[in-house]
Amino acid sequence: MKKILILFAKDWDQIAIQAKRDSRQYQFYFEGFDLARFPENINLLFFKILPFIKKLERKYQKLGLDGIVSNHEQFGALIAALLAQRLGLPGNDPLAIIACQHKYYSRLVQEKIVPEAVPKFSYIPYPLDSTKPLDIAFPFFIKPVKATYSVLCKQINNWDELEQHLHFNYFEEWLIRKLVQPFAEVMPLLTPLKIDPNGLLAEEIIEGEQMNLDGYCQNGEIHFLGMIDEVMYPGTQTFMRFEYPSRLPEEIQNRAKEIATKLLHGLNYHHGFFNIEFFYQPQTNDLKIIEINPRSASQLVNLYERVDGYNPYDVLFALAVGETPVIKKGECSFQTAASFVFRHFQKPQRQKKPSIHEVKQVLASYPDANIMFYFKKGASLEREFKWLGSYRYAVLNLGGLNRTDLFKRFGLLCQQLNFIDPLIKDQHLR
């Protein structure tokens, strides 16, 4: 069996890994911890990236690994590239990872390679300096230079809103810096970059339809898996669902692939999965890059399995051990699939988490369904509302014979789970 190290495994990774364990094709090893779940996230207190990499290098040199995988944006993707380089295993160039993950530097590179696909942008240092004028006019959209899951992403209309948005208590500021610290320690060792990753990226506001382009590179050759539509909750910039296949015209999808190809070659992105988010503006027919992520979108890739009949994790693991992936699209039960995100936009008075028995009943009725729960309370709930503007309490992946069947199954499943928020029930209208 090939030996694969999984770094900072995510809940969606575990579904695919369990299936592969049963096949006895790979032997998996795990390192890292879950930033979102207690008590694992206590490890963040003591986490130091360079000693962590050195420890793994010593440990796995003796074991004889065949490959390393991570779909973890915050720490895992960069560590996987660095560790693969040290152990002589297949992996991406750490410089390409940094060029993707440092969102301001990434914009500078994008501007050189595909300027037509880049919105106006500017860097804002943190802490704010009210004596220095901004290089971008209000209103603008702001996001951290180094972050994930849309944390602290928001439209800002004036200086007061900016100050309020970036006002943190002692623990919040410590947590933010602690999450960025590993990247900040590695960046100057590999690059001459001086732009502090604790700062923020401000961008002109773009409206339009959002989509996600998935694919992978091997030896510099680019392969696309497909495009997924990103649908927002009405009147927000918050994901409501991800739907495959995309309903955008083929011509638009092909243009996105052309932009992605130029960008990936320009970044020297030669190995591993990627996902690139785009805005499409129907009025102007423009495509703009939102961001590029140097990893698989683990929440979304099993949508391809439902519709196209192959598991992208098979591709991911083959890449990790240096094999050429073979994608065999097969007959499948579904023509469409979606990842539905359940959210509250106001603090719930009372949360009723479905019992294990109720969840088992749902999965018995819908064996293709995958559902994850993220219930929070107390300070964690308060922080999620502050940092994300909403509270994500569950995610459901589901297939359908067609879109009508997809939303019918979704509605019936919601009834069984007692998820009856009107915003959820009206998904089919978006």
Q: What would you call each of these model-derived segments?
A:
Residues 1-96, 127-130, 322, 374-384, ...:
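ATP-binding N-terminal substructure of ATP-dependent carboxylate-amine bond-forming enzymes
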Residues 49, 53-63, 85, 95-141, ...:
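N-terminal beta-alpha lobe that positions the nucleotide/phosphoryl donor
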Residues 117-119, 159-206, 238-239, 261-266:
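Conserved ATP-binding module of the ATP-grasp superfamily
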Residues 154, 164-166, 200-204, 210-231, ...:
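Beta-strand scaffold of nucleotide-dependent catalytic cores
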Residues 169, 354-359, 406-415:
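Short amphipathic alpha-helices in soluble, non-transmembrane regions
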Residues 255-276, 294-351:
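Active-site "cap" helix and flanking loop/linker of ATP-utilizing ligase/carboxylase catalytic domains
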Residues 270-283, 427-430:
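A short glycine-rich, hydrophobically flanked beta-strand micro-motif that places a catalytic Asp/Glu
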Residues 345-377:
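Glycine-rich active-site loop/lid that clamps phosphate-bearing ligands
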